[in-house]
């Protein structure tokens, strides 16, 4: 059983991962902030490698009662460093993305604590991380999109489309993906994909306020409420990414042979 003093201690994994800043309140609200060198986050090979490992650390730390996900500055995750992900046209490179990609989104979905996303601006890379949260609070400057997949020439099989399909609806998700469209926080609110839209400066404080309120409930209530809330999306991701990541890898391999279409 964790005590208040235990919760106030900083576990070693808090400083283990270069792209993720972690802080935790005395009541067990863990805030995970994506960043790159202290500024807005550019998703890269290191983050891809570390994210599933960080989530495993979070899952096994009983001091974590609520997770708040957020970005740095005026964007959640708006950029990606493609070359740092390795040569995805080769089997071993694709396998790394397959293993890490599946584990990252699945471990997030299977985390047995409530998740609140504090979306602090544009999210054009891995928006599924935010949208599968139990509560999504977005700034009025937020725009959601999927930058990498079709721009790179690969099928969106890594879980993003599964989450979009669940929270946006199948036909809307397909249209947005095909057209490489985007949608604002207000549109997401009207579609039911976002719970609250607030000014940028209020996003994280509002998320942490809500998280603090939730910690007043019994821990087991919060824990198993999260399991209940995400059991459907967890099943969908387990099924969808198993074949989806393989098909994404196939389209990535095809990039080495442009003459074949």
Model-based region annotation:
Residues 102-151, 182:
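Glycine-rich beta-to-alpha active-site loop
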Residues 134-135, 175, 179-181, 187, ...:
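Well-ordered beta-strand positions
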Residues 63, 70-103:
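Glycine- (often His-adjacent) and acidic-residue-rich active-site loop
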Residues 161-171:
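Hydrophobic, secondary-structure "cap" segments at the distal end of domains
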Residues 20, 43-67:
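A short, well-ordered alpha-helical element
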């Amino acid at each position: 059983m964790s005590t208040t003093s235990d919760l106030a201690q900083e576990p070693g994994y808090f400083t283990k991962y270069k792209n993720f800043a972690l802080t935790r309140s005395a009541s067990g609200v863990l805030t995970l902030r994506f960043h790159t060198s202290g500024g807005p986050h550019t998703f890269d090979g290191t983050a891809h490698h570390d994210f599933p490992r960080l989530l495993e650390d979070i899952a096994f730390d009983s001091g974590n009662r609520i997770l708040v996900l957020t970005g740095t500055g005026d964007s959640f995750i708006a950029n990606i460093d493609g070359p740092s992900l390795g040569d995805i046209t080769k089997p071993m490179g694709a396998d790394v993305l397959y293993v890490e990609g599946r584990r990252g989104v699945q471990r997030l979905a299977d985390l047995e604590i409530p998740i609140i996303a504090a979306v602090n601006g544009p999210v054009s890379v891995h928006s599924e991380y935010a949208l599968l949260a139990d509560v999504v609070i977005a700034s009025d400057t937020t725009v959601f999109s999927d930058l990498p997949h079709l721009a790179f020439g690969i099928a969106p099989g890594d879980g993003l489309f599964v989450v979009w399909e669940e929270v946006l609806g199948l036909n809307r998700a397909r249209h947005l993906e095909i057209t490489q469209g985007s949608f604002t926080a207000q549109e997401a609110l009207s579609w039911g994909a976002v719970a609250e839209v607030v000014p940028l400066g209020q996003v994280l404080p509002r998320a942490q306020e809500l998280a603090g309120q939730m910690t007043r409930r019994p821990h087991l209530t919060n824990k198993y409420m999260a399991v209940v809330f995400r059991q459907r999306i967890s099943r969908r991701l387990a099924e969808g990414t198993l074949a989806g990541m393989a098909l994404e890898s196939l389209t990535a391999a095809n990039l080495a042979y442009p003459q074949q279409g």
